[in-house]
Regions:
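Helical (often loop-to-helix) elements that flank the catalytic cores of nucleotide-handling enzymes
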Residues: 42-49, 194, 200-201, 227-239
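Charged, alpha-helical interface segments at or near domain boundaries
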Residues: 11, 15, 25, 29-184
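C-terminal structured domains
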Residues: 222-266
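Short, flexible beta-strand-to-coil junctions
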Residues: 26, 35-39, 129-130, 210-215, ...
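Short, non-transmembrane alpha-helical segments in secretory-pathway proteins
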Residues: 2-17
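Intrinsically disordered, low-complexity segments enriched in Gly and acidic/Ser/Thr residues
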Residues: 176-230
Length: 266
């Protein structure tokens, strides 16, 4: 027996009884707008259901629990935190950067603080409240008389204070480092030059970076063609598994800047 979108919606409604669900057609698929206490979230439930596979098991049940928790905690964050009441010192202390795909929030109707990063990714600024975070819009910067770039500087400073944790795997002469501090900002460490340069000193010009979803960053020391094939397969796997997928495109780092690097696997 396989999962259905209705089954997952029921799980969410158990936690958010007054939730309203609106369906919107985009191309040949359906996107759902969830509305809870005047806050909204857009989700692609059908893509998530496909990731679960055709059989129910403990692993897929865990993925559903994580998915529901992610949605519920985000709505609770929208309700709890009023950015209109923030003071400048509090904002500076708790602001962090996160990275999203350029397809995320394309129209930016909420006027979120959004900065360019790469052809595949954009940077957003969020207010962290320990159990989650809330995206910041430009009302905050206008209200507190601070520029997007200045606030981004403080956000990067807070990111750099986080501990660096990672696992290392070696396969056929290639080394793979998986960042896993599990603090909600592992993917965002692609913005931390200190982290990138720490690994660059180890790796040098064979430095590849992967950002398949928000909760991981893959740094690879690639020595041969097989290493590239492994990296691409890992990227696709992680992208499919992530709650907030970002990109399957890999980046190369030269000690100064990131450049998109397309890996073609035969």
């Amino acid at each position: 027996m396989s999962y259905t979108r209705d089954y997952i919606f029921e799980k969410i409604i158990e936690k958010l009884p007054t939730l309203k669900i609106h369906e919107k057609k985009e191309d040949d698929s359906s996107i759902f707008i969830l509305e809870y206490k005047n806050n909204k979230a857009k989700i692609d439930i059908d893509s998530f259901v496909k990731k679960l596979g055709n059989k129910k098991n403990s692993l897929s049940d865990k993925k559903i629990d994580e998915f529901v928790y992610y949605i519920v905690s985000n709505f609770e964050a929208q309700e709890k935190i009023s950015t209109s009441n923030l003071n400048k010192d509090d904002l500076i202390e708790h602001v962090f950067p996160v990275v999203r795909s350029t397809s995320f929030n394309k129209e930016n109707k909420q006027n979120l603080i959004k900065l360019n990063h790469t052809n595949e990714t954009d940077i957003y600024l969020v207010y962290d409240f320990k159990n989650g975070y809330k995206f910041l819009d430009r009302k905050v910067t206008e209200q507190l008389l601070i520029s997007d770039e200045e606030l981004f500087g403080f956000a990067k400073g807070n990111l750099e204070k986080l501990s660096l944790k990672y696992n290392k795997d070696s396969v056929q002469g290639n080394d793979f480092y998986f960042l896993n501090a599990k603090d909600g900002y592992d993917g965002a460490r692609i913005l931390d030059e200190k982290v990138l340069n720490y690994f660059y000193e180890k790796i040098g010009l064979d430095f590849y970076v992967g950002l398949p979803h928000q909760d991981t960053l893959i740094i690879a020391d690639i020595k041969n063609k097989k290493g590239l094939e492994i990296l691409q397969k890992v990227m696709v796997h992680f992208f499919a598994e992530g709650l907030v997928p970002i990109t399957t495109i890999t980046f190369k780092y030269d000690g100064n800047k990131l450049e998109s690097y397309f890996i073609f696997v035969e």
